[in-house]
Amino acid sequence: YLAIDHPSFVDRLVLAVTLSRQNATVQNVLSGWLELARQGDYKALMIDIAEKSYSDAYLKKYRRLYPILSKIGKPKDFRRFLTQADACASHNAYALLDRILCPTLVIGGSCDKIVSAAASVELAEQIRNCELYLYEGLGHAAYEEAPDFNSRVMQFLM
């Protein structure tokens, strides 16, 4: 909310694979993840997060690592995850987007299965002086998969 509440503090803004308010895609995803977390099924949760975040090409290379990933980093409990998921479920800044005054770059993935590509388009349509870039064929993890992601962001910020 910094760019909304204090626009003079922000010269340029990048919003990547995000949304301003709930949509059916994120509601469905979050409800599934919340159920897995409540059940304590870390393995199924991590696999579902990966399957919904990465492109098919990426997943083909890394699916064989699922058994290892499901054992690494398992939390003692899911309270932190549940708190973050609840915050995502109640977040709504849509009506305030017109208060963002600085040049803004919205980046999304055309195949985003978590927040949807439409969420990126919606953001870009509501923010004036906004540039939209959708990575074709990539999803929510576009920031990890696109080789030019960091350079694109840096070029915009410079």
Placement of each model-derived feature along the sequence:
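Flexible "cap/lid" loop of the alpha/beta hydrolase fold
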Residues: 1-5, 9-39
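Conserved alpha/beta-hydrolase catalytic His-Asp/Glu region
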Residues: 24-26, 44-96
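Short beta-strand/loop motif that positions the catalytic acidic residue
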Residues: 100, 106-108, 112
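Conserved alpha/beta-hydrolase "acid-adjacent" motif
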Residues: 113-119
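Active-site phosphate/pyrophosphate- and oxyanion-stabilizing loops and adjacent acidic/basic residues
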Residues: 121-122, 151
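Catalytic histidine-centered segment of alpha/beta-hydrolase-like enzymes
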Residues: 135-150
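C-terminal alpha-helix
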Residues: 152-158
